[in-house]
Amino acid sequence: MKNIKNIIIFVLGSFPDLKVFFTYRFLGVFDILKACTLMLLVTIFEAVSVATFIPLLELLQSEGDLNLTKPPSVWWQYFDTFYKYFGLELNILTLSISIIILVFLRQLMNYLNIVNLLTLKHRVGRDLAMSCLKGIFQADSAYIRNFKTGAFINTIDNQSQSAAGMLRAFATLFGIFLTLVAYFSVMLITSPLASLIAITIMGLIILSVEKWVKVALDLSKDVVNFRESYTNFLGDRYRNWRAIKISSSEDREVALAKTYAKKYFILSVKIAKNSGKNILVVSPIMTVFSLATLYITVIHFNLSISEVAIFILILVRLIPTSQNMANQRQMIAACRPSLHKVINVIKDSASKKENLNIGQSLTDQFEAINIIDVTFTYPKSKFKALSKVTCSIPTNKKTAIIGRSGSGKSTLTDLIACLISPKEGEVKFGSKSSNLFSLRSIRNRITYVSQQPLIFNASVFDNVQYVRPSASREEVMNACKTAKADTFINNLPNKYDEILHESGTNISGGERQRIMLARAFLKESDIIILDEATNSVDLESEEEITKALDHITKDNEKTIIIIAHNMKTIQNIDHLIILDKGKLIAQGKPEELKYDDNWYKKMLEQ
């Protein structure tokens, strides 16, 4: 097997794009051997069935008389020897049956080959998509943050499948090559000189479409880049549909979308026209040269009627074959930018991969999370998100981090979860630096509840159980009860089996947040971070969430960190941290800070 693998690597060295699939293990030795075997069998049955027509035509021409007036062809001698070996007589009936069997076997092998190539193509497309998805999710936050939504969706969905299409195009091209070799072999045995003329003509036709292959490559690069910007546009507009409707901007947005659609239409038409040139040029040229070759062979090489018939049959088959060959070369060129895009994502994300298991396990209890003289600046930003911030978050208490938008609140919690690393200073769990602990052990002790709830198109039970797949139904129900979510869940038609629509659109914002809170409680994390989680909920839901947090803090020794700029959200807080423009303004107990001259006091007065 190792020798076979080395041979495959050597052969694929001439096809760097194809070698990529093998190098990254999207394509195995068995896949290649299976595909090649099926295509080889298709070719063998095709060639032999065509060659069988020669002795059959010779028999028909002589009206079944085996004592031909003209010396039999080479093919007659081959088939006569073969039939005699099995004790069969070479006649019209046996040859006709042989042709029927060979055609059936050829079609059977072709069917198996098509199914195999399509299966392989979709499997590789799936594996490419999953490798990209895994790589992006496992990369550091800086890499993920720079990956736009449109590029993410386009890479996972469109580009992965398009890249896999190159694999099928290469396989089809290889099959065509085998078919051409088979046809020309039959022709060479029948009439060597005439066959050389046909081969030369075929080579010239293949070279003539080279410029269209380059055009297809350039157009495909434009399509890849355009799809990303188009997907970004659509995703951005869909996320902000409320703002569009309220501002009565529907017509303007539709007009803008039409400009994108028009550009995509123009690119698609250009690709279609470029591909259509194969039909416009290759087929007529091939027909003219085929007729010329046929004329030369009949006049100058004195071929028999049976040999002329086989030449006509092969030349007629070569016309669509040569056209298909040109199409597949264009397809490879069209898929190449997608393959490069996908492989670059896989390589780049791998180079930015977080190592989750390096370091000690954070298992000990600690009195506080200490932020010491931390400074952080986002890449490509001129401003410091945090500047020399020193503060402390006591464990088993409720801490609120407040401040204006852009004050650094979310950046601070990202530092606690080790999603980012400070440029200066350090984060400590107790007296030990976060750098000593593995990222996995730190994040296992943290649950994050965002302003936009992550709700799946699944049942209530499955949505809550997501963080702990092994959790029992009773544990899920207890978590929902703690999150004050059990009342509304029991009022749903199917209770815990009720299917929540994508993003939870069939329940209210407050109910979605309580589902998220139940999920956080089920995870049994020590630290729960709520990033403006009550910002878009009604007063009643906010009060329910506040009660749930009070309950979980009191009875379960949880550290609650609340990011907010709404004063109602931070009732019954034990500790308060105030940020402004990336700097620490104050920290301490709320009842003490409300007398200081700071942003918190001004907000309370308002």
Give the role of each language-model region.
Residues 25, 117, 137-183, 239, ...:
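Juxtamembrane loop-to-helix connectors within ABC transporter transmembrane domains
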Residues 1-51, 60-99, 105, 112-117, ...:
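Membrane-integrated ABC transporters
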Residues 105, 171-213, 270-315, 369:
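A hydrophobic transmembrane-helix motif
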Residues 242-249, 273, 318-345:
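Cytosolic ends of transmembrane helices, especially the final helix of ABC transmembrane type-1 domains
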Residues 428, 443, 461-502, 546-547, ...:
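ABC ATPase nucleotide-binding domain helical subdomain, centered on the C-loop/LSGGQ "ABC signature"
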Residues 547, 557, 566, 571-606:
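C-terminal portion of ABC ATPase nucleotide-binding domains
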Residues 522-526:
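A short, proline-enriched helix->beta-strand linker immediately N-terminal to the Walker B motif
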